[in-house]
Structures are given as structure tokens and as C-alpha cells.
Amino acid sequence: ENREAYLKERMLFDVSLFSTKQDSKKKPMRLMPMLRWTARIAAAIVIAVSGYYMTTDYIYNKNAQPQTITVPAGQRAQITLADGTRVWLNAQSTLTYASNFGRKERNVELDGEAYFEVTKNKKLPFYVHTEMNKVRVVGTCFNVCAYKGSKEFETTLVEGIVDIYPSCNDQVITRLQKDEFFANYDGRCKKTILPSYEYLRWKEGLYCFDDVPFSGILDKLEKYYNVKISVTSPRLLTHEGLTGKFREQDGIEHILRTISKEHPFKFSINEA
């Protein structure tokens, strides 16, 4: 209907161009309504188009439901996201993402530890959001360890490039290149070259510790084996620089016994 009205007005306007000089005095009377009508049509188109995108975005956001993957203590899991990205989740880790992940954005939220093999897509950067920091990548392989409440954030880059930001803004803290490691321990940041990828072998069920404080090892063992470890002698927690490599199937008793040979202590296991 609008188009027919527009064509009718257009025809009247064209006819007026061939009118006499006397009629030309009346042109403004014909032209002004024409301009107002054209403006209405243009406004209607703009409003209609804007309304379409607003409705589309509304439906997109409304239909997006959070998807949550939680891995219990003592277990690991591997998933593949809609864009083909593969994710390995360590014990006591949770990954959350929208049900429409990959359509207009690629955002995931991590509480715990995960290894990512991100499918490359320059138009849709991949973001990992954690309690303290967020990581931005296009397509790469990297590890993130950031358990809520620990005040610790670690990222190891295996391949590609990643940018690291605070969780609250978009000001880049640092950019990691291949084989680089970044950590934020309660506001104290450090960046180093990773000597090896051994400690990333948790994906295979191999736990590798290289110059790790005893307290840090105990914390990981609690997650890996779903146990609660109580230390009666605080002096033990001051032990630093412990190095070792253990298979998951060795069990926590074997690991503690092996460590106690280098740093003597006694332990007991109470079955619940």
C-alpha cells in the first residue's frame, strides 16, 4: 500500500514538472506534502529495520540459556563446543557457556582448570572469563587454572597468541607468545618461559610437580582424589620446591608416602 501511494505521489510530482508557469506557483503545495510523505516512508523503513534488528537481538538473547558442565572431584572430562573447540576439564571444574554459543560470540566462564584447543575464527574471538582475569584468543592451544576463591590465575600458552585482561575491563595486561606462562597470585603477577609441558599432562592422568610448595601439592591432591587433607603440623606447609611425577592410578597414599621419603612426615587415612 505504501508503495502504491508513493508511486501515485511520484506521478503527480512528475506531471507538475510539465505544468504552466501559473501552475508552477502551486508546486510548493504539491511538493511539500510529497516530501513529508517521502520522509514518512523513510522513517517507516528505518523504524522497521531497526525494529527487526532489535527484535532479532532480543530473541537471540532471550533464547540463550546457560549450559553448565561440572566435573566432580577425582574425575576429568572432555567436551567439544559448537564451533569445534575442544576442552579438557580437570577435577572440580565448571565450564559455563550460552546455548547459542558460536553464533554471534564465543564466551565461556571457567571455575577450575581447563585445557583449550580453540577453533580459529578471526571474526569471533574466543574469551575465557575467570574470577580474576579473562583470556582472549582467536585460535590457539592453552591451559587456564583459576579456581574461584583461590585468588590464583595461571595461563600456559602452547600454541598461538593470547591476550590477558583483568576481569573487570579491557586493558591488556600482557600478551603471551608460544611457550610462555603467566600467573596472577592475589595481585602479584609474573611471566616466564615454560621449561616443559609436563605439568599439562593432567589430561592424560599424569600429575607432574616442578618446584611446587607442599601446600600447593596438597591442594591439588584434594581435588584430584576427592579427599580432605588436614595438616596438624603447620611447619610442613613451609616446605617449598617439591618436584615429582605421579600417575593418577598410583593413588594418594602412594604419592604421600613417596613425598614423605624426601620430607619426613607421618599421615593416616580415615575412611568415611
Language-model features, listed with the residues they occupy:
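A residue-level detector for the "anchor" residue at the start of short, highly conserved motifs
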Residues: 19-41, 45-272
